[in-house]
Amino acid sequence: MRIVLAYSGGLDTSVILKLMQEKLGAEVITVTVDVGQKDDFEKIEEKAYKFGAVKHYYIDAKEEFAENYVCKAIKANALYENAYPLSTALARPLIVEKLVEVAKKEGAGIIAHGCTGKGNDQVRFNLGIKALMPEAEILQPVAEWNLTRDWEMEYAKKHGIPVSDKIYSIDENIWGRSIEGGVLEDPSIEPPEEVFEWTVSIEKAPDKPEYVTIGFENGVPVSLNGEKMKLLELILKLNEIAGKHGVGRIDHIEDRSVGIKSREVYEAPAAVTLIKAHQDLEKLTLTKWVIEFKSIVDSKWSWLVYNGLWYEPLRLALEGFIDEAEKAVNGEVTVKLWKGNAIVVGRKSDNALYDVKMATYEKFSTFDQKLAKGFIELFGMQSVLAYNMLHGVHSTSNISEIKEAIKTLE
């Protein structure tokens, strides 16, 4: 029996690695996918072999993650429940893809992961595996074998598995960092400063603001302060720049896929800055009808990704609309980073629908104001008539005008 295990090197997956050998007599192949987490990958590989893995794969997928996943999220202004930029959720389909590739290569019929039965990741992993490799058996030991934290820690001590004294559970990649556990489970308590690594507090942020200019092509960031660069590099640089100004801290109540409400704390400096800049450029370059409808599409796209439905055909259909709309989203946006805020202060585009000659109140305006009166009459006609009907309001002037018109016809 060969099993491919998504391996982080943490307590859960290290305990699972040993247990699958003991309980099932399995040969376990471990896979670690690098999506930008700040881990010691050499130590993770050492641990994998130490605890019995017959083979270990380290896969650097950072650039693929940026170009094929984060890119889509930016174009979709992806914020689940208007807050969470989907950092963890976006990475799961890519990790699943790599697990399936290894399983097929190694002839393994079982894919295992360390997800609990309470979180969203079990949905994302299981649905993804079933979509890409329907014949695979999915093993979820923490949930299926009802492993508790206390039991795992006791087992780890007996088998020489290092037990971290960290209070918080961390998941990170280039797009964001999520923090769970400890006092954060009480939503009434402010997150202590110790939980944050990517961002400084507002109190410690510089008093002087910093300005960044982000260039977009077809809705995708392609330059920072006039320098062309790949999306991965741009995100990493912006995480550092925006983070030092306290931008990107998120603390909100989130509805999980399994029906639980949870308090979630994130750091996402680049994500917050880029999405804000992108949305502003859309306002400059898209019609109000496209913007209005796209907000619905974006929200649904975010919901699908959050809930593990990456392989749902609706996602691709929504992306068809998004990609068409984004053809016009080209230009530059200047953002002021200051004391936890990312404030758009300037934008320009060759595709701008803003015309200063139309918008100005100065004498060189080209807008014919006389047209407004007739427009207003037509625009609000049904609303005014409905109000009058419901409230018994009748215009005698209108009646007189109608009578005069009838006489003219006679």
Swiss-Prot record:
Does the keyword Cytoplasm belong to this entry? yes
* Pfam families listed in its UniProt record: Arginosuc_syn_C (PF20979), Arginosuc_synth (PF00764)
For this protein, the record's InterPro entries field holds:
Arginosuc_syn_C (IPR048268), Arginosuc_syn_N (IPR048267), Arginosuc_synth (IPR001518), Arginosuc_synth_CS (IPR018223), Arginosuc_synth_type_1_subfam (IPR023434), AS_cat/multimer_dom_body (IPR024074), Rossmann-like_a/b/a_fold (IPR014729)
Q: What is this protein called?
A: Argininosuccinate synthase
Q: Which Gene Ontology molecular-function terms are recorded?
A: argininosuccinate synthase activity; ATP binding
State the CDD domains in the record.
ASS
Write down the PANTHER family for this protein, in alphabetical order: ARGININOSUCCINATE SYNTHASE
Q: EC number(s) of the enzyme?
A: 6.3.4.5
In this chain, ATP is annotated as bound at 6-14, 114
Which residues bind L-citrulline per the record? 84, 120, 124, 169, 178, 254, 266
- What pairs make up the disulfide bonds? none
User: Known HAMAP family for this protein?
Assistant: Arg_succ_synth_type1 (MF_00005)
Provide the family line.
Belongs to the argininosuccinate synthase family. Type 1 subfamily.
Binding-site residues, L-aspartate: 116, 120-121
Task: Supply the Gene3D superfamilies for this chain.
Answer: Argininosuccinate synthetase, chain A, domain 2, HUPs, Single helix bin
Q: How does it assemble?
A: Homotetramer.
Its main subcellular localisation, reduced to a broad class, is cytoplasm
Question: Gene name, please?
Answer: argG
Q: Where in the cell is it found?
A: Cytoplasm
Q: Which GO terms describe its biological process?
A: argininosuccinate metabolic process; L-arginine biosynthetic process; urea cycle
Q: Which organism is it from?
A: Pyrococcus furiosus (strain ATCC 43587 / DSM 3638 / JCM 8422 / Vc1)
Q: Which reaction does it catalyse?
A: L-citrulline + L-aspartate + ATP = 2-(N(omega)-L-arginino)succinate + AMP + diphosphate + H(+)
Query: Sorted alphabetically, which keywords does the UniProt record give?
Result: Amino-acid biosynthesis, Arginine biosynthesis, ATP-binding, Cytoplasm, Ligase, Nucleotide-binding
Pathways per UniProt: Amino-acid biosynthesis; L-arginine biosynthesis; L-arginine from L-ornithine and carbamoyl phosphate: step 2/3
Write down the top EC class of this protein: ligase
Superkingdom of this protein's organism: Archaea
Q: Which GO terms describe its cellular component?
A: cytoplasm
